[in-house]
Amino acid sequence: MKLYGLIGACSFVPHVALEWVKIRENADYEFEPVTRELIKSPEFLSLNPRGAVPVLVDGDLVLSQNQAILHYLDELYPNSKLFGSKTVRDKAKAARWLAFFNSDVHKSFVPLFRLPNYAKDNETLAHTIRQQAVEQILDQLAVANEHLESHIYFGENISVADAYLYIMLNWCKAVKIDFSHLTQLSAFMQRVETDQAVENVRKSEELKV
């Protein structure tokens, strides 16, 4: 089984999931770091025509999209409890947060990493778009912060949902979004970093917090 990913990108999440599987069920995997140039190459486009990560290759199965990969791994390795539990109800709660982070919060970062073409030559418009993106991200993170006021994680135990929020908080630091007023988030990051799989992947991807 091989996972293709960009260092520090959302592919961090299935990378952590595979590391949990390795630790908990002794199932090995390979992580193939790629560059933004490589994901547009004919070789990579044959795996994912969208030229995006993550991509998981398991035999003749090629999967893209984080949620598809994570649900596949959870079905394949139920004892690893990638959604924090083996019960349907608890897994559904973690899956709901995963969907929020993947579909809503992640999307809000796009203008910060890649401005729309129509704004690239208009600094005033570009500034407005970036500012609106930051405000939206902070509004969304406030929802997560409120949950953490009464919960340790976003599942019954640490799960792929937590790994997703963790890597996005790293992005916040990278683009200098100050979330210090959301007082639960820094403590959450510290809790997640105590997990062995997260620590292993952080070292593997050489992430700096």
From Swiss-Prot:
Function: Conjugation of reduced glutathione to a wide number of exogenous and endogenous hydrophobic electrophiles.
Reactions performed catalytically: RX + glutathione = an S-substituted glutathione + a halide anion + H(+)
Protein name: Glutathione S-transferase
Location of this chain's protein in the cell: Cytoplasm
Domain GST C-terminal: 87-209
InterPro entries: Glutathione-S-Trfase_C-like, Glutathione-S-Trfase_C_sf, Glutathione_S-Trfase, Glutathione_S-Trfase_N, GST_C, Thioredoxin-like_sf
Residue ranges of every copy of the GST N-terminal domain listed in the record: 1-81
Residue ranges the record marks as coiled coil: none
Any one cellular-component term (Gene Ontology): cytoplasm
SUPFAM superfamilies the record matches: GST C-terminal domain-like (SSF47616), Thioredoxin-like (SSF52833)
CDD domains in alphabetical order: GST_C_Beta (cd03188), GST_N_Beta (cd03057)
Residue sites binding glutathione per the record: C10, V53, Q65, N66, S103, D104, V105, H106
Source organism of the structure: Haemophilus influenzae (strain ATCC 51907 / DSM 11121 / KW20 / Rd)
GO molecular function, one term: glutathione transferase activity
